[in-house]
Amino acid sequence: WLEMARWHCLRTLWLRDQNRPHNAEAAVCKGMVPEICVDVIRDCLVLHGHYGYTQDLPIEQRLRDVCGQLIADGTPQIQKIIIARHLYGREFV
């Protein structure tokens, strides 16, 4: 999942560099990537046990950073509305 998210973000940035429309792709990145990262970080926390929650490892800081990204530029629910409007049109969403 993480590699898929990475490639999707790189493709979105490429579209932006080419001055092509990329609003829906950007919404997918903003809505999908933080959720995937939270899942990956939670797996890391489970793997490391209670030591993963301490400040000795950077995992807890990364979890806080990603949780901030979940609400930055709109929550995942807002991003899903943007994607649906792009796919189905404003009159349906």
Protein language model regions, located:
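Alpha-helical interface subdomain recognition
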Residues: W1-V93
